[in-house]
Swiss-Prot record:
Keywords for the protein's UniProt record, in alphabetical order: Cytoplasm, Pyridoxine biosynthesis, Transferase
The protein's name in its UniProt record: Pyridoxine 5'-phosphate synthase
Protein family (similarity comment): Belongs to the PNP synthase family.
Residues the entry annotates as binding 1-deoxy-D-xylulose 5-phosphate: D14, H15, R50, H55, T105
Catalyzed reactions: 3-amino-2-oxopropyl phosphate + 1-deoxy-D-xylulose 5-phosphate = pyridoxine 5'-phosphate + phosphate + 2 H2O + H(+)
Cleaved signal peptide residues: none
Any one GO molecular-function label of the UniProt entry: pyridoxine 5'-phosphate synthase activity
Positions marked as site (Transition state stabilizer): E156
Gene Ontology cellular component list: cytosol
Length: 247
């Protein structure tokens, strides 16, 4: 667990695959995007293999497992299909996320407190393959404490409410919620990551929170890459979060 100013950047490449799937082509290649991201300073690559396969495909994950120089953070729903696939590929990191077919993107955190037995069984099973398991949850004390009880070594705090806040008061309130969540997670002995909806204009305040280990960012990078290229987009984000963490 890192409580220093060293903060990691996990690059989510799902939306490179979204662009590919929109036309059913072989391009753009998310694997190339991952390699470019690593070259530009990414500390890890995040992919979410959804039940509906709307972006990332099994083939992408298998190729990434073979070629990544950093590490894969494999996001997945708590289903038997995904559990079996994770056991097959044995990623370095696994993040359990909620998932519904209708959502545009992951809309909220996993309800760990409401299904502790199920999540504990999943954490135990996935830990046996050597993966570090994290839980994508809201910055809520009840969920954080439940995450510790089920045996997860790490959590990823959902920053979507902060990203969606529109007034200065809302932004301040949601940022404080994240700060409190980070402190609660650290007090519970957990590694604390964060992500969802972060972009170039809101990431610095989150990156400045002491105790956050890693930020996972995707859509904003892919969007900015249209104008500056993927390596440039990743390098700019990495510079932003490192500068904010040192401030």
């Amino acid at each position: 667990m890192s409580t220093s100013n060293r903060i990691l950047l996990g690059v989510n490449i799902d939306h490179v695959a979204t662009l590919r799937q929109a036309r059913g082509t072989r391009y753009p290649d998310p694997v190339k995007a991952a390699l470019d991201a690593e070259e530009a300073g990414a500390d890890g690559i995040t992919v979410h293999l959804r039940e509906d396969r709307r972006h990332i495909q099994e083939r992408d994950v298998l190729l990434l497992k073979d070629v990544l120089q950093t590490r894969m953070n494999f996001e997945m729903g708590v289903t038997e299909e995904m559990m079996a696939f994770a056991e097959r590929i044995r990623p370095a990191h696994i993040c359990l996320v909620p998932e519904t077919r209708q959502e545009l993107t992951t809309e909220g955190g996993l309800d760990v407190a409401g299904q502790e037995a199920r999540i504990k069984a999943a954490v135990e099973r996935l830990s046996k393959i050597g993966s570090e398991v994290s839980l994508f949850i809201d910055a809520d004390e009840r969920q954080i404490e439940a995450s510790r009880r089920v045996g997860a070594p790490a959590i990823e705090l959902h920053t979507g409410r902060y990203a969606d806040a529109t007034t200065p008061t809302e932004v301040a309130d949601e940022l404080q919620r994240i700060i409190d969540g980070v402190n609660c997670g650290l007090n519970e002995g957990l590694i604390v990551n964060a992500g969802h909806g972060l972009h170039y204009h809101n990431v610095e305040a989150v990156a400045a929170i002491k105790g956050i280990n890693e930020l996972n960012i995707g859509h904003a990078l892919v969007a900015h890459a249209l104008f500056v290229g993927f390596k440039g987009a990743v390098a700019e984000m990495k510079a932003l979060i490192l500068a904010a963490a040192k401030a």
